[in-house]
Regions:
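RNA-binding accessory domains that recognize and position tRNA/RNA substrates
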Residues: 1-217
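Cysteine-nucleophile active-site neighborhood
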Residues: 215-237
Length: 237
């Protein structure tokens, strides 16, 4: 049992863990976590709030989050919204008050399990129903999530560098190389790093053909990482 936070509802997915001390907004918005419930081992989550610039995708694909302690009050000059409100805004169900490190040990020893978490202020959970939802969920094996999270249309990345305290996210001029990035669930920060090297980046869908890509006459081609079963996305390569 824990305390519900974020969006009020129920989420079923593969329970994984993350040991990072910082970057929770980037982690939760990373498309690689599509279909997963993230268990954070670091106890103090939320201390820098959230902002409109650090998301790794234009949509949050994570199913849910699990924290050890209550969300920390934000204290950061870039913070625009506290994490609890941000989770509500993005419809992410969360639980706090769990022994996340013991859960991590279980995941490490037994493998990532299917799981369901539920946030209901009235306490009307229906445990049997939640268990059935978990058992019926097919899991990520054989699941192609690249098609779900990938861009549907080709677009040109606007060319902001990685963030610095002095300049924030700065736009790049005088681009020297053209890179085609195939989007299997690409993170925004990867695109920013290409901009650091003065690359003009064209992002294409995961099912773009070789002819489509070569027609753009790129200096290089980048295949991103992404969520789901790698065996199910091999067909695109």
């Amino acid at each position: 049992n824990g305390i519900g936070i974020g969006y009020e509802g129920t989420a079923t997915g593969e329970v994984c863990f993350n040991t990072s001390i910082t970057g929770y907004q980037e982690i939760i918005s990373d498309p690689s976590y599509a279909g997963q419930i993230i268990n954070f081992t670091f106890p103090h989550i939320g201390n820098v709030g959230t902002n409109n610039e650090d998301n790794e995708s234009n949509k949050v694909w994570t199913k849910g989050v699990i924290f050890n302690s209550e969300i920390t009050n934000p204290s950061n000059y870039r913070s625009l919204m506290d994490l609890d409100l941000w989770l509500k805004k993005n419809k992410i169900v969360g639980l706090t008050g769990l022994d996340t490190r013991s859960l991590t040990n279980l995941i490490r020893d037994k493998g990532a399990p299917r799981g369901t978490i539920s946030h209901n202020r009235q306490g009307n959970f229906g445990i049997k129903k939640l268990i059935n939802s978990t058992l019926k969920w097919p899991g990520l094996n054989g699941l192609d999530l690249a098609k779900t999270v990938s861009t549907k249309y080709k677009f040109v990345w606007k060319g902001f560098k990685t963030w610095t305290k002095e300049q924030g996210y700065k736009k790049i001029k005088n681009k020297k190389l053209k890179v085609v990035a195939i989007d299997y669930g690409i993170k925004t920060n990867i695109l920013r790093y290409f901009s650091n090297f003065y690359c003009d980046v064209i992002v294409v869908p995961c099912d773009a053909s070789a002819d489509d890509i070569l027609a753009l006459k790129p200096s290089g081609i980048f295949l991103s990482n992404g969520p789901g079963d790698p065996a199910a996305t091999g067909k695109y390569a």
